[in-house]
Swiss-Prot record:
Gene Ontology cellular component terms for the protein in this record: cytoplasm
Name of the encoding gene: secB
Alphabetized UniProt keyword annotations: Chaperone, Cytoplasm, Protein transport, Translocation, Transport
Species of provenance: Vibrio atlanticus (strain LGP32) (Vibrio splendidus (strain Mel32))
Annotated signal sequence range: none
Keyword Phosphoprotein found: no
Listed name of the protein: Protein-export protein SecB
């Protein structure tokens, strides 16, 4: 018990920087889209990736792509790559993977969501507020899929 408390006390996590890595907004059917009744179909794709920049320093990128169609036509497509540089040390491999795959994207998401909302409004479309994402559940699902694939390869 004392060892676990000591290990937790040694763990270190810090946000060094949050930055916008890439952004794109396309409204291919403007201004014709503004003349149509607004009944949007919103599709959200997200992905994360991370890489080590130096000892205990990691870049995490959260990529959000929002495609909104109205009827059959694309109203707009918005892609944001929100980046962060984080320092993390004295973590076990599983803890570090969870930190980079769930905790850090959870920190980045509000920044990416705000950028998307701002771009959509600047395109003069109705405001788009993305619902919160449970990155912990997505990460656990990813781990389960990896385990199933590993079992399938062994069989």
């Amino acid at each position: 018990m004392a060892e676990a408390a000591q290990q937790d006390a040694q763990q270190n996590f810090a946000i060094q920087r949050i930055f916008l890595k890439d952004v794109s907004f396309e409204a291919p059917n403007s201004p014709d889209m503004f003349q149509k009744e607004w009944n949007p179909d919103v599709k959200l794709d997200l992905d994360t990736q991370s890489r080590e920049l130096g000892e205990g320093v990691y870049e995490v990128i959260l990529r959000l792509t929002v495609t909104v169609k109205n009827a059959e036509d694309t109203a707009f497509l918005c892609e944001v790559q929100q980046g962060g540089i984080f320092s993390a040390s004295e973590m076990e491999a599983g803890q570090l993977a969870h930190c980079l795959g769930a905790f850090c994207p959870n920190i980045l998401f509000p920044y990416a969501r705000e950028t998307i909302s701002s771009l959509v409004v600047k395109g003069t479309f109705p405001q788009l507020n993305l619902a919160p994402v449970n990155f912990d559940a997505l990460f656990m699902n990813y781990l389960q899929n990896q385990a199933q694939q590993a079992e399938g390869e062994q069989a």
